[in-house]
């Protein structure tokens, strides 16, 4: 029997992920900074994408925890006193970077899409 966070992860993350049509990322255009105006433009693009998907009968599910913990790992943010979780965040950063390469620092959204 699984309990606590493992059970929640299986139900909320893995189960949903296996049933979705695909995953996607949205990144700031090359050369754009993380200034508010750039982030707002990118947010507008994300909103248009999300609304278009909804019109097509598709659902979009954000997956922002991965981005948050990858950022914590990259920046060395001490979000907890638990050394295991700090190592996990650093590993999360490494895995994200392995998946998307040099685009990792520009990512602003990760999601899944499906019916």
Language-model features: locations:
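Acidic, surface-exposed loops and disordered segments
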Residues: 1-115
């Amino acid at each position: 029997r699984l309990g606590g966070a493992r059970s929640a992860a299986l139900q909320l993350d893995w189960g949903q992920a296996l049933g979705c049509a695909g995953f996607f990322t949205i990144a700031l255009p090359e050369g754009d900074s993380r200034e508010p105006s750039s982030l707002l433009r990118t947010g507008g693009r994300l909103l248009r994408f999300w609304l278009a998907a909804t019109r097509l009968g598709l659902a979009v599910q954000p997956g922002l925890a991965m981005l948050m913990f990858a950022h914590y790992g990259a920046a060395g943010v001490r979000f907890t006193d638990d050394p295991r979780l700090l190592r996990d965040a650093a590993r999360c950063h490494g895995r994200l970077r392995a998946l998307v390469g040099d685009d990792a620092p520009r990512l602003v959204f990760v999601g899944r899409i499906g019916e």
